[in-house]
Amino acid sequence: MKKYLLGIGLILALIACKQNVSSLDEKNSVSVDLPGGMKVLVSKEKDKDGKYSLEATVDKLELKGTSDKNNGSGTLEGEKTDKSKVKLTIAEDLSKTTFEIFKEDGKTLVSKKVTLKDKSSTEEKFNEKGEISEKTIVRANGTRLEYTDIKSDGSGKAKEVLKDFTLEGTLAADGKTTLKVTEGTVVLSKNILKSGEITVALDDSDTTQATKKTGKWDSKTSTLTISVNSQKTKNLVFTKEDTITVQKYDSAGTNLEGKAVEITTLKELKDALK
């Protein structure tokens, strides 16, 4: 009888021990906020291997891992019902999280999302060959660049979603994004290089010199000055906040009049090209 009770006690002790190790709660852990609105639970005590236990729930999936540090950094892993593997990597300074989904082999990427502390993020989706097919870059201010139909050479379709309207264009193999707006004979092109540098150009197919528009880009002020027959008519400023403002020149084309007005619709941008 004593042996029986001893056996039962040992089993219960092992179960309790397993529960303590496998599950974290508010009593035995600390919650740490991560970029992207995620949270990770960090055990208050080290395990038998001298590691801190980590737990997080992302998209209703429970992820677990261990870390040498108790600040929330480390790597957590899990498995979805379709056997695909999930990995969450938290930077040592908690400034960045990398959330990856792999196929069942644990090597072929399905998707990857990197989120920074300023709420900006880059999300990539991959095709069956493990090549990038879609990419979305969200800036800290909420505006974003969306890339779809990405081919093996890196080219594809592009879209910039601003605060109030959207610009569409293409992604070149060299990483250059070109977004275009057409109004009559005038084409406005916003170019975003792989480095993030922005340039803006204006082309007019009008053959009449007296009405033909030209544009001059000033990278220092991010301003496109539009002229007609060599006389300045208006300035378009592409601000750091990813907004566009327009301000007209006087009839002589020498001084700016009034105040710069923010463009809030695609129609207003097209009107500025008239």
UniProtKB/Swiss-Prot annotation:
Source organism, top-level taxon: Bacteria
Compartment(s) where it occurs, according to its Swiss-Prot or TrEMBL record: Cell outer membrane; Cell surface
Protein family: Belongs to the OspA lipoprotein family.
One Pfam family, short name: Lipoprotein_1
Lipid attachment residues per UniProt (S-diacylglycerol cysteine): 17
Keyword DNA-binding in record: no
Alphabetized UniProt keyword annotations: Cell outer membrane, Lipoprotein, Membrane, Palmitate, Plasmid, Signal
SUPFAM superfamilies per UniProt: Outer surface protein (SSF51087)
Name of this protein: Outer surface protein A
PROSITE patterns reported in the protein's UniProt record: PROKAR_LIPOPROTEIN
InterPro entries: OM_lipoprot_Borrelia, OM_lipoprot_dom_sf
Membrane topology, from the record: Lipid-anchor
Main localization (coarse): membrane
GO cellular component: cell outer membrane; cell surface
Residues linked to a lipid group, N-palmitoyl cysteine type: 17
Signal peptide as annotated in the record: 1-16
